Amino acid sequence: MRSLFENIFPVVESLRKRKQLRCFFFMRKPPGLRLRFALHSLRGDAVREIESCIKSLVRRKVIAKWFPSVYEPETFKFGGPEAMEAVHAHFFADSKAWWRWEELRRGANTSIESRLLSLSVLNDLFAKFLDGPEEVWDVWCRVATLHGASVVSEGPAIQAIRIEDLIDRVTPGEQVILRSYLSCNGAMARRFGAIHAKGKLLFGNRLVLPHVALYHWNRFGFTPDDRASIFTAMMHAWSPNV
């Protein structure tokens, strides 16, 4: 998989700089990966460049096969058409941040583990959207129930760590990643606020945010145990009943 992304992300960045790409993100989904490209136009060399890259990966046996498909966004899961655009922008930023993190991690240039990075990012995201710790706790409870887990107040003694708690304690490379999350989290929260003010948000933030968390964890490749360790700790950390 590493070789695939080593080839894909330079193409993504090149298309973005040439203003041919609106969005890119990926999902881990059987039988492999789903790569989602949103181009400004299907004409021109952008499609050929993407296909050439992927066909080269097949020839070099980096991947077994590929096929194009129609993308049908889960619009209503994420709050409606306008909200979906904001979520896609966040997915793009999250995908790029994940790859930067992977490059640091493989080079042994990280000072924190992936789960700590993730919980700080999600705590920051939830807090930017919501009014107070009780609402953040409620979202973590919803994340737990989406995994079939029970809402509990017991858990490991850990603080509700946010990005600002880590950013001055990590390596310069990690700081770049955390700053990118501060930016994209803030951008999505502001966009949702504007959509809500226009009456165009079909479902509330606390219904949408758990699904954003699940997609983020999918990109990071977290196991069920990884996920449970995060949401269990955060239910305890944010609980108003502790």
What are these regions (language model features)?
Residues M1-V242:
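An acidic, charge-biased composition feature
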